[in-house]
Structures are given as structure tokens and as C-alpha cells.
Amino acid sequence: MNALFIIIFMIVVGAIIGGITNVIAIRMLFHPFKPYYIFKFRVPFTPGLIPKRREEIATKIGQVIEEHLLTETLINEKLKSEQSQQAIESMIQQQLQKLTKDQLSIKQITSQIDIDLEQVLQTNGNQYIESQLNNYYTKHQNQTIASLLPNQLVTFLDQHVDNATDLLCDRARNYLSSAKGTQDINDMLDTFFNEKGKLFGMLQMFMTKESIADRIQQELIRLTSHPKARTIVTSLITNEYQTFKDKPLNELLDASQFNEIAENLSVYVTTYASKQANKPVVTLMPQFVDYLEGQLSSKLANLIIEKLSIHLSTIMKKVDLRGLIEEQINTFDLDYIEKLIIEIANKELKLIMSLGFILGGIIGFFQGLVAIFV
């Protein structure tokens, strides 16, 4: 009976010592948070292991995550996966659907990124357009009009300049045949005869003013169809057209005239753009929105992935993942780190404490046997 009591007592004492030792060892991982001193001598095992090695732990965790977990290769593979492409494309589609559903205008879209589009147009827009136009004038002022116009436009004008004769003669004939043309001829005759009274008196002996006006009108109408008259008109138009093409820009418009045009044009363009910016994008550019929803979303997703993949190395260097993790861990309170580790390894820590009690009990059992038989 005495031997059994000794064995049980030794088992209990050994279990208590083993369990408490492991509990203290676990506590010493975190506590104390700062070193303690007796006189000038630091107390051993202060601070605890984790507070003492905090910076080293942060560095190692950052290194492990950067070199083995969130590696450039792994991120690149994940980025190029079908799942990532679908996620990016879905996000783009959602934004496009919101654009259509909410009837967002360009001005509203830019305001979401803190850009006052109207102010930008009225200040920077005016200055930019004026500057570009004036720079163009300075650079090309000595060049001919023909050299400044697009080749296709010059070719088109060359091919159709002869049509101006038909157009001009037709318009003249229509005008002369109209009531307005008749009235204008009569008015000019009245002015002429008032200035030349004697001549009118002589003509009245042979015909009336109305018959004179009618005769003049018929002759003018006939001239619009006469081959000789049309040849003269064609020659004049062709010569003037060629003269216009061969003129340098600065002969057609001097610097002050061009600057005035540039100012007026910049105001017109920015005002027009400002008005259009208030209209819903889906109303302003319906075909473009359809194109965005139908085809561009997939192309844009591929472009985003491609550009991110190309610049991933640079991005990761700029982000400095290791340094970011180190900095973040070093900002954590030690209480929070302790709580975090205990939450993660709670089950394992309890097993360690239980193992301490079990091993202590086993050692106590053998110590009891030794105490009985020795």
C-alpha cells in the first residue's frame, strides 16, 4: 500500500512538473515583452523569444512569402489563368452595364476620378488648341495651300473644279429667271435711266422700259448657256483655283488673322465638347458602347493581363513585398502577435501542454519504481 502511494504521488508530482514546465516554456515564447535588469545585469530569458527575435522573424516571414509563396512566377501563372481573365472581363462588363443603366455622361465619369472636365476644357483645352494651331501656322506658313491640303482632297477638287461652271451658270440662270431677278433688273434699269435721263428719253421713242428689261433678262439668260460664256467662266474659275492652290498660307492669312481664327475655333471646339460631355455616353456613342460590350471587354481584359504580365517584375520591385510584410509585422503589438499565434496554433499548444503532463507522469512513475526498489 505504501509502495502504491509512492508511485501515485511521484506520477502526480511528475505530471504537474512536466505540464507546468511546458506551460512556462510556451509563455516564455511571448513574455516578458521587454528585458528586465537587476542592477546592471539583464535577467536571463528576458525578453521572451518572439519579442527578442521579432525583427528577425518578420524578415524571415517576408523572405519565405516572397521567395516561396507569392513568387513572380506564381502570380504570373495565376494572372494568365482562365479564371483571372474571366474575373477581369466580368468586372469590365459590370462597369459597362452600369454605364448604360445609369445613363452616365463623360462629365460624370470624369468627376468620379476628381476631374472637373468643364474647367479642364475651358482652361487647358483652349490653350492647347490655340497653341497647336499657332504652332502649325508658324511651321507651315510658307507652304502652299495645295501642299497643306490632304492629297485625296486636292485630287477630288481637281477632278470636280470644272463642275463649278455648270453650278454657277445654273444658279445664275435660276436667279435671272426668278421674280427676284426680274425685279433686280428693273431696279438697276431705273437707277441707270435716272442717271442718264436724255438717253432714256431717246429709247422711249422705240421701246418701253419693261421691254428693255425683258430683252436684257432674256439675253443674260441666253449667255448662261452660251459655249463661249461658259468657256470664259471655266477659264476664270480654273485660274483662280490654281492661284489659290499656289498661294502660301501667310499670303492667304497673316499671323494676326490666323490667331483670331485659332481663338474662335478653340472656343467653339471646347464649348461644343463641353455640351457633348453632358450627354449620356450611350446616347452620344451607341455603336461604340455596343462595341465595348460585345468585343472590347475581352480584348481589354487580355490587354490588361498582358501589360501586367510584362511589367510584373517592375511592379513587384516597386511594391517590395518583403519589405511591406516586414514593416507590417513590426507594426503589430506584441499582444496581438501572441493572440494571433495562439489562435492559429491553439490545438497544437494544448497538445504540447498535455504531452508535458503525460511525460511528467511517466517519468514520475519510473521515479516511484526507483524509489521503492533502490
Swiss-Prot record:
Species annotation: Staphylococcus aureus (strain MSSA476)
InterPro entries referenced in this protein's UniProt entry, alphabetically: DUF445, UCP032178
Membrane-topology descriptor: Multi-pass membrane protein
Domain of life where this protein originates: Bacteria
TM ranges: 4-24, 354-374
Any single Gene Ontology cellular-component annotation: plasma membrane
Location(s) in or outside the cell: Cell membrane
Keywords: Cell membrane, Membrane, Transmembrane, Transmembrane helix
Family under the similarity heading: Belongs to the UPF0754 family.
Keyword Cell membrane in annotation: yes
Signal peptide limits: none
Name this polypeptide is given: UPF0754 membrane protein SAS1767
